[in-house]
């Protein structure tokens, strides 16, 4: 069994360098919620050095709230903004001898695209326009995954080690109780259940079906690195290979 482990980079976390030794893919902030041209260049350089798959992490234009504000923008605006961000990172990667492999939207752009078909279509169209060989990463079972498949893109269905799930397989909003799993044992058990058995227990007790092709590891928690190391060790014991 194989699983991809991904993390978000270039968002001001001190643990970025060490996290890169534990993941197989990383998503680089492209300036709209965090980061800038210099951090993008630095992140690409480190990903190449560590043999980690390079990915873009485009967002709504929302630096003030770290890309977590809901927005209702015309699909053509989202298309242009997404193409702008991923095109910039693709060029930065190419200039350093690397290749951008995937795109994973950030924050509310990710969450809204999971449920809003028009938004999902705009993102998938931008990814396809940039490079049809790119992998589109989205919430397992979401509209974004469906849109990617409609454009013939390779998709990668994502699950979260430290997020609570609702009965329909969507994430519990960060504003609600149960959104974040802070107990390490619970997060580890949930991750193994999703990867090995394709299901997750919701906060209301029902089982939701999920297709786990990549696991998101957040690097900004107090015990994030320790958990990442433990998850890697657990996967090794279970014979689960970590690779992009």
Swiss-Prot record:
Pfam families: LamB_YcsF. InterPro entries: Glyco_hydro/deAcase_b/a-brl, LamB/YcsF/PxpA-like. Keywords: ATP-binding, Hydrolase, Nucleotide-binding. It catalyses: 5-oxo-L-proline + ATP + 2 H2O = L-glutamate + ADP + phosphate + H(+). Gene3D superfamilies: Glycoside hydrolase/deacetylase. GO terms for molecular function: 5-oxoprolinase (ATP-hydrolyzing) activity; ATP binding. The keyword Hydrolase applies. One of its GO terms (biological process) is carbohydrate metabolic process. SUPFAM superfamilies: Glycoside hydrolase/deacetylase. NCBIfam families: PRK05406.1-1, PRK05406.1-3, PRK05406.1-4, PRK05406.1-5. Catalyzes the cleavage of 5-oxoproline to form L-glutamate coupled to the hydrolysis of ATP to ADP and inorganic phosphate. Forms a complex composed of PxpA, PxpB and PxpC. This is 5-oxoprolinase subunit A. It comes from Shigella flexneri serotype 5b (strain 8401).
